[in-house]
């Protein structure tokens, strides 16, 4: 990593819940963890698109936003689960409340992503340095997993763009 003097000033985390809709469904129905599954569309009429998929479906080449018929050609045993948006909103709120334990500067972006500016609260966890920021990121990841069953990618940087790139890289 290249040192930049801006890194001494701000510490931003980008938190991204992995395969959020599919992950919530797998938490609620653990039997879905071991089969290719996706959230989306109407399985009876065979219309609609894939909103999210688990890692097993991803290995078959199933992509977010592709049609159900296309996904089923790639993965005939794909289990399609209808979306439960109210449940996803509850999980999102729970996760954002976890973030508030670390900073009051939480900026949600959609239902499954948030930026956290931890600069002002780092002294509560150690020094104001990159190692402490990584420690906080790990603690948030572990807390979210323990309390919700969901996995989270977290990028750490001195600005939003690089923090987002970091969370994408950590997936």
Regions found by a protein language model. Name each.
Residues 1-171:
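Gly/Gly-Pro- and Ser/Thr-rich, intrinsically disordered tail segments characteristic of DNA damage-repair
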